[in-house]
């Protein structure tokens, strides 16, 4: 991974399934809160087939405490779809990942780049913040047309990249630990501090 990166259970074995589970759990939930849920969930449901076949009451019990239960319901619907259409293996194709229930551009990008080394961006709020700060652009990062433009530009930069998953994870890590949203960013620790605001 990246020098100085946090040790996280989903990074130890970044299979498509484990990347998917972690990214869905991490939506609107802090990393430290997700760790024990991830461990318990993947121990009981180690693959797509187990998730697809899990009784709903047990599935919801495993998710209890994370909230936003539609996330796990959508995961199970997607798991059934993956079993039916892809033989239980998450597709190594960004566009096909996007067609799965509950998977948007960020999650599809994370799975494709981290698990399959496909050069597509995984752009979340942290990454948008980094890119706008480095570019000294004060455009509202919540503006959809601006987000689309940044994703397109990042996709172009990533073409031909040997380790797109590591690149995406490095950006995520930088945004979570150095180029933080609240409080003062730790600019002296940033590898891009000479280019930035």
For each of these PLM feature ranges, what is it?
Residues 2-188, 192-195:
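Catalytic cores of DNA base-excision repair glycosylases
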